[in-house]
Amino acid sequence: MNKTIIIRGGGDLATGTISCLHQCGYQVLVLEIAKPTAIRRSVAFSEAMYDGETEVEGIKARKITQFSETKACWQDGIIPIICDEKAEAVKAVPHFAFVDAAIAKRNLGTTIDMADYVIGLGPGFTAGVDVDVVIETKRGHRLGRIIREGQAIANTGIPGIIGGYGKERVIHSENAGVFHGIAHIGDLVKKGDLIAKVDDAPVYATLDGVLRGILRDGLPVPEHFKIADIDPRLSERENCFTISDKASAIAGGVLRAICIYENELRSGEGRK
């Protein structure tokens, strides 16, 4: 049986799913854009697009330039990641499942015929129409649930509450320009501390806490672009360097959906 799963996106939430499926014995191929913009970079396999190779919780991902390089990575226990914005891998690499984990809040071109089993994470997908199932990505009671009909909860634009803070903990650019980071992931910051600049415009910490994520230095950003994330829980600095509870819950939903699909195939009930 084919054990290959193609995953669109290598950001921090996608990384939870990628890591989970890899550890469960699936061969995972990650598709990314040329210059990813993850801010929780210490736990995002997408960083391999810049550094060539990255490691999250002991699992390595390696940038490749040809689909033919995937097998060598899998044999070495490494996750291959390639620049493939149009998902050409769907035609080039035999696989049984496709997961759109870009968390773009919209469909970037995923269709239900891209694999035997197609999963979409978060809003932007309709189960039974452009994907087989959707996984809920909004914090709360339904996080990680499998949706077989309809869509995930719509994006509100308001971050989930952590330590009593919601929108205050996520920082967006006030102007377009080139991002220049000053603080680093894991730094303890105070409200009002200078943590970055966009061109010459200063970016200040919005609350006291741990800088959980900050955009890669030197990237151009538009106005109102997400550039940093502060965790108000000062005692949990190590969380900056491990896959989040949210990412793990989503990963559990994806794994459960795939296991259900495989069981249905064995019993003759699944779509082939």
Give the predicted meaning of each segment.
Residues M1-K272:
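Well-ordered secondary-structure scaffolds
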